[in-house]
Amino acid sequence: MKPAFNPSEFIVYTDGSCHTQKRFGAWVAIILYKGSEITLQGSEPNTTHHRMELLAVINAINYVCNNTSGKIVLQIFTDSQYVVGLPAREHKLSTTHFLTKSGRTLQHADLVKSFFQLLEMHSIVLHKVKAHQSTNEAINYNELADQLARGIVRAAVQ
């Protein structure tokens, strides 16, 4: 799906990757704005795929907010059902104080709380895209983000 581009909007593509046995992960965010393309990336040991997906989105939002002024609109495209599904779970997670049914703290509660705060403060629209799908766009940014994140993980675990 090619996003309709509004000059006041930032288009963001994110992805996270994790080597499940070695628990090393990486995240990538590609930010498009007025013809510019900015790529952010990072990595962490002892992590999970969900944490990397969430960090990609949070870091993209924070980058845009820290480098602009005034009203911003972010259109975020991700293949992570986990990230896209979080806003629908906000009320339940908040009322249970981010605890699971067994009374343990929700995994990644720190990031989930930060994510919810960012959603409250800014105009953010999340779009679920299918992973590894070809598009008619000149550059498939979702696939590019995936390749970059997987490349970081591969290089680190060799």
Stretch-by-stretch model annotation:
Residues M1-M52, N62-V64, P87, N140, ...:
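RNase H-like nuclease fold core
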Residues S17-R23, I58-E143:
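RNase H catalytic domain
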